[in-house]
Every structure is written in structure tokens, then in C-alpha cells.
Amino acid sequence: MKKTIVLLLLLPLLSCYNTEHNCKDFKTGKFKFEYKVEGVKKTTVFERNDSIEIETFEGKTDTSRIRWVNNCEYVLQKIHPKNMVEKKAIMMKILTTTKNSYIFEFGIVGSDAKQRGTVEKVSE
């Protein structure tokens, strides 16, 4: 009985927490993704429209096709892959959004291995 009462008291508090999902705000624009590799900060800048993403990393530019699965998930496929690894499609999933950023999860299509990151929108 006590467990039921505690659960009923906590339920309204849990329902107040809503994860923001304004994925449509991030379908197009210019973005920045910062991360660390062996303690060294790396930055990737990319621009995305509804069907193409152009990414620049360490002075090199790559272009990928985008296939939107739904408003928060899309698949990236490099247009000019340079090796077998780059031929593999990458599934991207926006998990939460804020006004100018989003947290996402990504991995090679068909693989259970996933990574997470945060992207900042720098312009429309």
C-alpha cells in the first residue's frame, strides 16, 4: 500500500519532465560538432539542406546524401567514398533539442555500436 502511495505521489513529478524534440528546427542550416580524440579537441563544421550534407574536417570537405526516416532520424551516405568504411551508411538520431543545439546518437547502419555527441547550430 505504501509503495502505491509513493508511486502516485511521484507520478505527477515525472510527467513534468518533457524531453524537447524540435527536430524540424535542425533539418537545415550550418552546424558545428566539437569532440575530443585522445585529449585533442577536434571540430567538424557542416551545412545541411533537406537532401545533402557538406562536412568540413581538418581542411577536407566531404558530401553526403541525406535520407530522412522521420523528423528526428536520417541516414547519411557519402557520395564519393574513398574506402570500404566510408561506403557504409550512418544512421543519425536526434535525441533531444534545445534552442541552438541537439544531442544525437549515431552508428553504422546494421551495427549495435552507437556513439553520442552534441551539435550546435551556428546559422540558418
Show where each model-derived region lies:
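Positively charged n-region of N-terminal signal peptides that target proteins for export
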Residues: 1-4
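C-terminal motif of bacterial Sec signal peptides marking the signal peptidase cleavage site
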Residues: 13-15
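Bacterial signal peptide processing site
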Residues: 17-19
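Tryptophan-anchored aromatic micro-motifs
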Residues: 23-39
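N-terminal glycine/threonine-rich, aromatic-flanked beta-hairpin/loop signature
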Residues: 42-69
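Short, exposed beta-strand-loop hairpins at the edges of beta-sheets
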Residues: 55, 103-116
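A short, structured loop/turn motif at beta-sheet edges
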Residues: 65-73, 94-101, 121-124
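An anionic, turn-rich surface loop/hairpin at beta-sheet edges
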Residues: 76-99
